[in-house]
Amino acid sequence: MAVNPLDFLKNMSSVKSNIDNIKKEMSKITVCGKAGSNIVTIEMDGEFNVKKVSINKEFFDDLDNDAFEQMVKSALNDAVSKVKEEIKLKTMGVLPFGM
């Protein structure tokens, strides 16, 4: 079966429009990664930019350096996972298979 080049171009235009819409939706995403019962929280946007890091000072004095570094790493990884999940949910069914 032959592919009509005009149909292909129409589909590409639709894909570009979908990608533009996804980019807009991604810019609206904000998640909060947490670690250590909220001792460390990291706010991240849909483009994986860290917007805010919060440390509960009440517990900070009791932490050693290794524990604190582990909590920051865990909170950051939690935020990244949440952004990926939001992107997955927002793009489900929007992009053609394989993109």
UniProtKB/Swiss-Prot annotation:
Cellular localisation: Cytoplasm, Nucleoid
Alphabetic keyword roster: Cytoplasm, DNA-binding
Gene Ontology molecular function terms on file: DNA binding
Superkingdom of origin: Bacteria
UniProt cross-references to SUPFAM superfamilies, sorted A to Z: YbaB-like
GO cellular component: bacterial nucleoid; cytoplasm
Listed InterPro entries: YbaB-like_sf, YbaB/EbfC
NCBIfam families to which the protein is assigned, alphabetical: DNA_YbaB_EbfC
Family membership noted in the UniProt record: Belongs to the YbaB/EbfC family.
Subunit structure: Homodimer.
Function: Binds to DNA and alters its conformation. May be involved in regulation of gene expression, nucleoid organization and DNA protection.
UniProt name for this protein: Nucleoid-associated protein EbfC
Organism: Borreliella afzelii (strain PKo) (Borrelia afzelii)
